[in-house]
Swiss-Prot record:
It is found in: Nucleus. Belongs to the Antp homeobox family. Labial subfamily. Residues 25-39 have a biased composition (Low complexity). A motif (Antp-type hexapeptide) lies at residues 182-187. GO terms for molecular function: DNA-binding transcription activator activity, RNA polymerase II-specific; DNA-binding transcription factor activity, RNA polymerase II-specific; protein domain specific binding; RNA polymerase II cis-regulatory region sequence-specific DNA binding. PANTHER family: HOMEOBOX PROTEIN HOX-B1 (PTHR45946:SF5), HOMEOBOX PROTEIN ROUGH-RELATED (PTHR45946). Residues 25-80, 130-151, 187-211, 257-304 are annotated as: Disordered. Keywords: Developmental protein, DNA-binding, Homeobox, Nucleus, Transcription, Transcription regulation. The keyword Transcription applies. This is Homeobox protein Hox-B1.
Length: 304
């Protein structure tokens, strides 16, 4: 008896079924799945008298790496064998079921075993592909993704970003777009055009136009300039209230009057002689339509 042949998984028949029972070539060539209509011929249990009735055609026997149907462990009876008469019939034992480590073309002493989980995807496909007459429910490991859960999860966000970039943003409908609201401060112009409206005599315009002084206002301003070239704020407020002007108008008139006096001193070097009874400053102010007053006149006196 050849024990090496008996112990080899690729050559040893299950339950003395014969040389053609499970003569598988290699477990690596197992296909992933078979349609239910791919099974052709089925071995009969009654005709050959061997265990494995309802098993599929040699297409499954040659591609499967180990038996696909677990023998019932409760039945410990021997089955009739069609092997040569020189061998005693062997009983089916639960130890030959597909739930253990199986040798791959080696003897027991070599220790060449492989775990069934390495072919989880192929075995799961075989169990789903065969019908009621094919492989029954066995202790097959669950299917696993080829790359693992970690790598599959890592691919998801990367491809999600690419898909989001390819998608174009939907165009908003025109009726739903809100109209731009115009506030009151938007309507006010920064630099409004100046109008040529002439202000009333003695009243300053808010737009900063030229102020037309009356003769009475010019006379009182010239009197004050004769005594004081520079005014304090209290005196400026008093003169503005007396002449019905604002404080800014009085301040600007005194600034212009000082610049005019300095210009005349630079150009002529001397001023023309003043008429008797009038100070020298009054002679240069003839163009300003100012009248001469006596030196004894009080600056605060107002003429009617």
């Amino acid at each position: 008896m050849d024990y090496n042949r008996m112990n080899s998984f690729l050559e040893y028949p299950l339950c003395n079924r014969g040389p053609s029972a499970y003569s598988a070539h290699s477990a690596h060539s197992a296909p992933t799945s078979f349609p239910p209509s791919s099974t052709q011929a089925v071995d009969s249990y009654a005709s050959e008298g061997r265990y494995g009735g309802g098993l599929s055609s040699p297409a499954f026997q040659q591609n499967s790496g180990y038996p696909a149907q677990q023998p019932p462990s409760a039945l410990g009876v021997p089955f009739p064998s069609s092997a040569p008469s020189g061998y005693a019939p062997a009983a089916c034992s639960p130890s030959y079921g597909p739930s253990q480590y199986y040798p791959l073309g080696q003897s027991e002493g070599d220790g060449g075993y492989f775990h069934p989980t390495s072919y989880g995807a192929q075995l799961g496909g075989l169990s789903d592909g065969y019908g009621a007459g094919g492989a029954g429910p066995g202790p097959y490991p669950p299917q696993h993704p080829p790359y693992g859960n970690e790598q599959t999860a890592s691919f998801a966000p990367a491809y999600a970003d690419l898909l989001s970039e390819d998608k174009e943003a939907p165009c908003p409908s025109e009726p739903n777009t809100p109209t731009a609201r115009t506030f009151d401060w938007m309507k006010v112009k920064r630099n409004p055009p100046k109008t040529g409206k002439v202000s009333e005599p003695g009243l300053g315009s808010p737009s900063g136009l030229r102020t037309n002084f009356t003769t009475r206002q010019l006379t009182e301003l010239e009197k004050e300039f004769h005594f004081n070239k520079y005014l304090s704020r209290a005196r400026r407020v008093e003169i503005a209230a007396t002449l019905e002007l604002n404080e800014t108008q009085v301040k600007i008139w005194f600034q212009n009057r000082r610049m005019k006096q300095k210009k005349r001193e630079r150009e002529g070097g001397r001023v023309p002689p003043a008429p008797p009874g009038c100070p020298k400053e009054a002679a240069g102010d003839a163009s300003d339509q100012s009248t001469c007053t006596s030196p004894e006149a009080s600056p605060s006196s107002v003429t009617s």
